[in-house]
């Protein structure tokens, strides 16, 4: 084995189940993998540990961490061939960390399980949506973390997305969503709301998931839209409204132009809309490009039901 290539799909974070955590666990959440954009990392044999390409410095830092965590000796040359845009709500940091860790581990002949990958990459201690969409693709629901326990949240459910459901992404040119210390500080300022958490759980269990399982896009989309507003209300004191300032009008536009469901991924500013069929997707994408008027980009994507792909050369 002289090289390993890992391709990891982006993810849309659809919301948290319990933002502050009134029970024994905190956060919990759900999200879905999309086939574009993607992070593609290649690791090849080398005497030294080096990296090149977009986000090379971050990939190199991850490689150093995972070598120590997994007890890997020797070098590797890491090439970041493609990178998900950073801080727009598509999970760029997690996917880069997991893909780099998997590439370095596989090059060394190791096949760590998902929890070992997350631990070595230093990911998944708050939200495990990025981890489970990386491993499995599709739509995932995770159960939250116990306070003081440094372990990714357990996977509660995973379902494949229908092949004929399409997703339109609108990524406006705007201030990036929160990350790093600013994100950590934001979570300390949130307050518990048991009523909202109960409504979110009810919506996921009795409408969103049943709608997905029965391939009822109307039910799924309505539940998704309502879920996004409930979650957004919890974060409104932090982000200045139910959605990122640049995202609010775009969510309304998605719904007004025919999306069955729409919302903001993570802290934004990326907005997404779900439709049935490629033709409807192309039409919505064209109309959303007019809404952005050059102030960002729009992409029609498919849902990814496979998760990360690992190719050994």
Label every model-predicted segment.
Residues 2-7, 15, 21-25, 113-257, ...:
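ATP-dependent small-molecule kinase catalytic core of the GHMP/sugar-kinase superfamily
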Residues 82-106, 126-134, 262-266:
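Glycine/serine-rich anion-binding loops at beta->alpha junctions
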Residues 1-88, 92, 105-114, 305-306, ...:
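ATP-binding N-lobe of GHMP and related small-molecule kinases
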Residues 34-35, 72, 255-256, 263-267:
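A structural signal for short secondary-structure junctions
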Residues 40-43, 259-265:
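Short, flexible, solvent-exposed loop/turn segments with mixed acidic/basic and small polar residues
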Residues 17, 30-33, 91, 95, ...:
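Gly/Ser/Thr-rich beta-alpha loop segments that engage phosphate groups in nucleotides
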Residues 247, 265-272:
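Small/polar glycine-rich anion-binding or flexible loop at a beta-alpha turn
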């Amino acid at each position: 084995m002289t090289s390993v290539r890992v391709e990891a799909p982006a993810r849309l974070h659809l919301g948290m189940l319990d933002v502050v955590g009134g029970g024994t666990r905190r956060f919990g959440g759900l999200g879905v993998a999309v086939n574009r954009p993607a992070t593609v990392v290649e690791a090849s044999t080398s005497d030294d540990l080096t990296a090149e390409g977009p986000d090379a410095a971050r990939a190199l830092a991850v490689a150093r961490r995972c070598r120590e965590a997994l007890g890997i000796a020797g070098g590797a040359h890491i090439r970041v061939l493609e990178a998900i845009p950073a801080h727009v709500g598509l999970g760029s940091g997690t996917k880069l960390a997991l893909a780099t860790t998997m590439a370095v581990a596989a090059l060394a002949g190791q096949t760590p399980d998902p929890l070992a990958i997350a631990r070595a990459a230093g990911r998944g201690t708050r939200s495990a949506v990025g981890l489970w969409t990386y491993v499995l693709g599709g739509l995932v629901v995770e159960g939250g973390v116990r306070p003081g326990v440094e372990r990714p949240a357990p996977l509660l459910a995973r379902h494949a997305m229908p092949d004929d459901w399409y997703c339109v992404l609108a990524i406006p040119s705007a201030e990036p969503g929160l990350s790093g210390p600013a994100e950590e500080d934001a979570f300390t300022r949130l307050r518990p709301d048991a009523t909202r958490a109960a409504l979110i759980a009810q919506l996921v269990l009795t409408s969103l998931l049943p709608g997905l399982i029965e391939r009822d896009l109307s039910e799924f989309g309505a539940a998704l839209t309502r879920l996004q507003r409930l979650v957004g209300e919890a974060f409104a004191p932090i982000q200045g409204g139910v959605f990122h300032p640049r995202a609010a009008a775009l969510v309304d536009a998605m719904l007004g132009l025919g999306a069955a469901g729409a919302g903001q991924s993570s802290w934004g500013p990326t907005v997404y809309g779900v439709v049935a069929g490629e033709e409807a997707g192309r039409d919505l994408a064209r109309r959303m490009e007019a809404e952005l008027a050059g102030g960002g980009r729009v992409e029609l994507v498919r849902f990814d039901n496979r998760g990360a792909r690992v190719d050994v050369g």
